[in-house]
Amino acid sequence: MTVGARLRSKASSLVGRGPLGRLRRAGDEETDAIVEHLEGEDEDPESQDCEREEDGRRAGTPSARRVHLAALPERYDSLEEPAPGDKPKKRYRRKLKKYGKNVGKAISKGCRYIVIGLQGFAAAYSAPFGVATSVVSFVR
């Protein structure tokens, strides 16, 4: 038996579903109320028996403008416990140390390359004139 045939037979054996894709049980009042409300929205909007307010919606239907407010307690208690004070300081110190090392390396390499560049510029400038150039090696 192929996969498609198995799925077809399984789908045909399933219990029929309601109009909204949910199983409807007899006596389920909440589901019945929701379905009746949703099916009621499918009515003809131009029907005579629906009373409308001045903004174009049915009387008694909730609108998006209605705001529900809830009273908050006097004192707010956070759900998360604050972290101890010494941990961020250690982490911050480690980051500063790491960045300091990297900046120090960049400056020393940059200084070395600047000295090499200046020596090359001096050699190129003085070479046409036949003046001997002394190259001083830059050692840290």
Curated annotation (Swiss-Prot):
**Which cysteines are cross-linked by disulfides?**
none
Pfam families given in the database record: RDD1
Q: Which GO terms describe its biological process?
A: regulation of response to drug
Cellular component (GO) terms are: 9+0 non-motile cilium; membrane
Record keywords, A-Z: Membrane, Transmembrane, Transmembrane helix
Q: Where in the cell is it found?
A: Membrane
Q: Where are the transmembrane segments?
A: 118-140
Q: What spans are recorded as compositionally biased (Acidic residues)?
A: 29-53
Q: What ranges does the record give for the region Disordered, renumbered to this chain?
A: 1-95
Asked if the Swiss-Prot or TrEMBL record annotates the protein with the keyword Nucleotidyltransferase, the reply is no
Record's bilayer topology term: Single-pass membrane protein
Metal-binding as a keyword of this entry, yes or no, is no
Give the protein's function.
Regulates drug efflux through modulation of ABCB1 localization and activity.
Name of the protein described by the UniProt record: Required for drug-induced death protein 1
Q: Which organism is it from?
A: Rattus norvegicus (Rat)
